[in-house]
From Swiss-Prot:
Disulfide bonds: none annotated. InterPro entries: Ribosomal_eL38, Ribosomal_eL38_sf. It comes from Plutella xylostella (Diamondback moth). Belongs to the eukaryotic ribosomal protein eL38 family. This is Large ribosomal subunit protein eL38. Transmembrane segments: none annotated. GO terms for biological process: protein-RNA complex assembly; translation. Coiled coil: none annotated. GO terms for cellular component: cytosolic large ribosomal subunit. The lineage of its organism: Eukaryota, Metazoa, Ecdysozoa, Arthropoda, Hexapoda. Keywords: Ribonucleoprotein, Ribosomal protein. GO terms for molecular function: structural constituent of ribosome. Pfam families: Ribosomal_L38e (PF01781). Gene3D superfamilies: 3.30.720.90.
Amino acid sequence: MPREIKDIKDFLLKARRKDAKSVKIKKNPENVKFKVRCSRFLYTLVITDKEKAEKLKQSLPPGLQVKEVK
């Protein structure tokens, strides 16, 4: 089941959870989507600012598997 998250801090808390498996980063010309797969839900965060997206990518937990999709 998908869920959309509006807050960056809330997304980082979800990404640091024990059941978070992987993060997919989808880049479009107008926005960047971060999708974190947890055991029950797929949480999605949409960011329109490219600089914020790069900072968020750097602050993801190191043990999490990150896949970039063009």
